[in-house]
């Protein structure tokens, strides 16, 4: 008997292709096939959602509901192949479209992500190195507002 006969899975053998994020099937595949490690499920995803949830519906780290709470930026750092792009794709896709929650198999991650699901308009663009960051961001926002 061979391993492939015992275990059925879809291998993850590619990096996130930014150019394909407009394809619905590709998006669904990224969400459906996301591998939730214990750290992602219990710490990283809840922490990201906590910082993105401006409705204050999700505060697992806050003991007193009436105390002030500050949000802050997060920087995702890791070695090549550790899932940084997949994680950010998952978060941005769910934040943009609540329907993707149904594709998530992990109950704890689904619960955390439900706090931000469908509440954001995501603007995706690639950064070059020949312009000022401020100019690039302002141009992209202006362009999307005209759409």
Model-based region annotation:
Residues 1-82, 89, 94:
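Walker A/P-loop-proximal flanking segment of P-loop NTPase domains
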Residues 71-147:
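P-loop NTPase nucleotide-binding core
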């Amino acid at each position: 008997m061979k391993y492939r006969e015992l275990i059925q899975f879809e291998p993850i053998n590619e990096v996130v292709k930014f150019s394909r994020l407009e394809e619905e099937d590709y998006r669904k595949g990224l969400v459906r096939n996301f591998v939730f490690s214990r750290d992602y499920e219990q710490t990283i995803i809840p922490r990201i959602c906590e910082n993105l949830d401006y409705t204050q519906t999700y505060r697992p780290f806050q003991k007193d509901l009436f105390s002030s709470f500050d949000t802050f930026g997060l920087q995702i750092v890791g070695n090549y192949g550790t899932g940084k792009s997949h994680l950010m794709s998952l978060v941005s896709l769910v934040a943009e479209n609540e329907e993707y929650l149904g594709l998530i198999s992990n109950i704890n991650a689904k619960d955390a992500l439900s706090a931000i699901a469908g509440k954001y308009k995501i603007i995706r663009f690639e950064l070059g190195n020949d312009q000022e960051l401020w100019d690039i961001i302002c141009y992209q926002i202006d362009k999307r507002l005209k759409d």
